[in-house]
């Protein structure tokens, strides 16, 4: 999360950063001849998809990326919306659980969807569950050669596709939580196109399918009947393209 256009990072849970003057550090490293611009990574990725990818030519789009964490970029009337304090699109911190029993999130709060469906938390849960003394007998473990630490979300997705009970149950828990966050955003923003991407979703097609099905049930029909749901197209190039174009527009 950025505090200001100078690039002060308020909180980057997956990097362990709080109140880091990244813009100043970057400017010092680049020198005075190279202007430094700092953008939220998912905003840059979303803008890259708007300029040259899955949201190209669409004036109202929501791009959601589920990787190590979860974030979104909001495009409205052809413009990137970053909000009054640059926090627009922080969909990973939409609450899907409450109370002391809710999962802790790196942002310092509890119950955020990222604390359940973010890739780092999913990987940790898989390892913890399958390494437990009374671990479920899951095909996902066999797919990874029997090593709980080697089991990836891709293995779990494949196991679920093959009918594995534990994998189906776990995905059946995560998909509705992601759908709550997506459905709330779709109801609030009414995008024409929803772009889905990120390292986790791109490798777990069944989880993506289940989340989309749950989303269509969770959001109002008036908001979804014309909604196009597509996969991100640009991969790792999206952020570079988006940041370059945003920097060009900032000068």
Segments and roles (model prediction):
Residues 1-3, 70-76, 80:
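Active-site and channel-lining beta-strand-loop segments
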Residues 3-6, 24-36, 48-60, 80, ...:
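ATP-binding/phosphotransfer module of carbohydrate and carboxylate kinases, centering on a glycine-rich
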Residues 7-18:
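A charged helix-plus-loop insertion that forms the helical arch/lid used to bind
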Residues 37-43:
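Glycine/small-residue-rich loop that forms an oxyanion/phosphate-binding "nest" at active or ligand-binding sites
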Residues 39, 63-69, 73-75, 95, ...:
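Short beta-strand segments
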Residues 45-51, 72-74, 93-95:
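Adenylate-forming
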Residues 87-92:
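Structural signature of FAD isoalloxazine-binding scaffolds in flavoprotein oxidoreductases
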């Amino acid at each position: 999360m950025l505090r200001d256009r100078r690039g002060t990072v308020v909180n980057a849970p997956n990097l362990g950063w709080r109140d880091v003057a990244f813009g100043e550090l970057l400017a010092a490293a680049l020198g005075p001849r190279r202007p430094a611009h700092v953008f939220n990574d998912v905003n840059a990725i979303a803008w890259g998809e708007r300029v040259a990818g899955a949201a190209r030519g669409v004036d109202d789009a929501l791009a959601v990326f589920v990787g190590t964490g979860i974030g979104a970029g909001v495009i409205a009337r052809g413009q990137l919306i970053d909000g009054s304090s640059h926090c627009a699109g922080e969909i990973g911190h939409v609450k899907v659980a409450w109370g002391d029993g809710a999962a802790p999130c790196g942002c310092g709060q509890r119950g955020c969807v990222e604390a359940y469906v973010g890739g780092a938390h999913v990987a940790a849960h898989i390892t913890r569950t399958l390494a437990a003394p009374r671990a479920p007998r899951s095909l996902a473990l066999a797919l990874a050669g029997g090593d709980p630490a080697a089991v990836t979300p891709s293995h779990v997705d494949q196991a679920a596709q093959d009918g594995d009970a534990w994998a189906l149950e776990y995905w059946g828990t995560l998909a509705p939580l992601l759908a709550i966050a997506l459905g709330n955003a779709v109801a609030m923003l009414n995008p024409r196109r929803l772009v889905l991407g990120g390292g986790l979703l791109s490798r777990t097609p069944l989880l993506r399918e289940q989340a989309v099905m749950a989303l269509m049930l969770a959001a109002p029909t008036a908001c979804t009947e014309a909604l196009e749901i597509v996969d991100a197209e640009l991969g790792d190039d999206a952020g570079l393209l988006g940041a370059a174009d945003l920097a060009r527009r900032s000068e």
